[in-house]
Amino acid sequence: MEKIFLIAIVGPTAVGKTALSIELAKKFNCEIISIDSVQIYKRFDIGSAKVTPEEMNGVVHHLIDELEPNATCSVYDFQKLARDKIDDIHSRGKMPLLIGGTGFYMNAVLNNYEFTNLEEKTYDIDVEKAKQYLKENYIDTYNNIDLDNHRRVINAYNYVMNEQKSVTTNNNGDTILEKYNPYLIVLNTEREVLYNRINKRVELMFEQGLEDEVKGIINDYGTELQALGAIGYKEMLPYLKGDVSKEETISAISQNSRRYAKRQLTWFRNKMNGVWYDTRSESLLNDVIGDIKNKFK
């Protein structure tokens, strides 16, 4: 079987994944696949820190603005979309470069995860009971989902209740698909530095027009969209209703983002066999390029 060589970059929110991905894409003739459950939707730009055309700098990106805001996309759907993109990029003689902050989604794409369609059967259960069940029986899944996103919690519960081979039940879930030969990069930095970056990013989102972005989406599609349950968007709903202040909203998004970053790092340490790099290093780019060359020589 011909191996597909690829690069994958993971890291917590605001650590600096985008900048590195662009440099590596230019160096190794890559096209980038975004492994992000929100950036795949049109119009969800500012709150998801979606890469801008200027930041892309001519590098082709996939699974950005792929779906309409009112579409639904489970991890089962995302896995197929991403794997199809990998095959397409490879068939054209380029190297796929995957980038994302959610280890569960990255592992679902690269590893031997098998999912059945969630629509086959759904269970009516209280969110808190679903959380408790996942915590007691599927702790890895519990630790990697946004517990404040009720849709994600229920989806995770349905996956395991449908007796799928999921993150904690698939015997081969920790092994890379035989067809892939990835170089997995895990970016991190000192906690205080990371948290400061997160706080500044949230403030910048408001300056860039997050409020108007969310207003426009709600006016056109309502409040029941899947992506509105994500950090950076769900906190905006009570703010737009007038229930909380702007300052309280900024604080809530920042706090939720920091907590999520902590869970992301826990997942990367426990469930991903990658090479770790500190983004504060002045030699980061050269170090990564050298290591990739050694991997694929």
For each feature predicted by the language model, list its residue ranges.
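Phosphate/pyrophosphate-binding catalytic cores of soluble transferases and nucleic-acid-acting enzymes
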Residues: 1-297
